[in-house]
């Protein structure tokens, strides 16, 4: 009766997010479902997920491969839409936003950090960090100043002119974090940020994320590694598309 147990757990965990509207939450999801149709079969990647995230939260979303955690991360990042349910971001209903509003959110309000870094191989660290500023039309002189400041904030001030193949894995991830920070977003989404790094470098990257949280950033990371999740202040566990546990560590 595992399904029934998970549904009961989901209903209990959703109590705080059951009422309509965003309240004081930075993020509120209410009864999110994501269903894919493959031939005659329906695959439910998310099954009625509801939770609130207050400002300045440090949250880890954990679960095994195929649990739905990356699908949920894509929803939070406005990269995908639910089959049903609602998502409020900064008090606004995401389903009512047009393409320009969504593009603005992805560029200005959310900073993305990916497992594979997603850096342009022929561009310098400085130019890679400038890219979000180029997309939103920031003037060149201000753009360079902001990109330099972001790289200095992740201790890469001396590597601005280096290309990705001239940097270590940890340095590449620092460039990716600087790129996520450059627009001063309210939320940083990190999808398996240490997945391609050794244990020592992983700890360095997590200490950097810890520091960014202490500076007031909302950090949401997806991971399957429990030692990485332990850096967060709150952990939501996903199993078979549902929340199986929502616990506060500190």
Describe each PLM feature range.
Residues 24-239, 243:
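ABC family nucleotide-binding domain
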Residues 1-35, 245-250:
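ABC-family P-loop ATPase nucleotide-binding domain
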């Amino acid at each position: 009766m595992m399904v029934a147990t998970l549904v009961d757990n989901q209903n209990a965990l959703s109590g705080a997010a059951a009422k309509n509207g965003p309240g004081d939450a930075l993020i509120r999801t209410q009864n999110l479902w994501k269903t894919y149709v493959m031939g005659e079969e329906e695959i439910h990647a998310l099954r009625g997920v509801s939770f609130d995230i207050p400002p300045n939260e440090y949250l880890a979303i954990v679960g095994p491969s195929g649990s739905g955690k990356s699908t949920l991360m894509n929803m939070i990042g406005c990269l995908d839409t639910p089959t049903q349910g609602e998502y409020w971001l900064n008090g606004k209903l995401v389903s009512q936003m047009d393409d320009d509003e969504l593009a603005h959110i992805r560029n200005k309000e959310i900073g993305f950090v990916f497992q594979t870094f997603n850096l342009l191989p022929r561009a310098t660290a400085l130019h890679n960090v400038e890219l979000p500023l180029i997309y939103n039309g920031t003037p060149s002189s201000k753009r360079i100043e902001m990109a330099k400041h972001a790289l200095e904030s992740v201790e890469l001030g001396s590597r601005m002119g280096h290309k990705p193949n001239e940097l270590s894995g940890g340095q590449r991830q620092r460039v990716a974090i600087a790129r996520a920070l450059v627009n001063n977003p309210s939320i940083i989404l990190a999808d398996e940020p240490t997945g391609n790094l050794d244990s020592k470098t992983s700890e360095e990257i997590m200490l950097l994320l810890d520091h960014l949280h202490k500076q007031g950033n909302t950090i949401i990371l997806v991971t399957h590694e429990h030692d990485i999740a332990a850096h967060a202040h709150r952990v939501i566990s996903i199993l078979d598309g549902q929340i199986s546990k929502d616990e506060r560590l500190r």
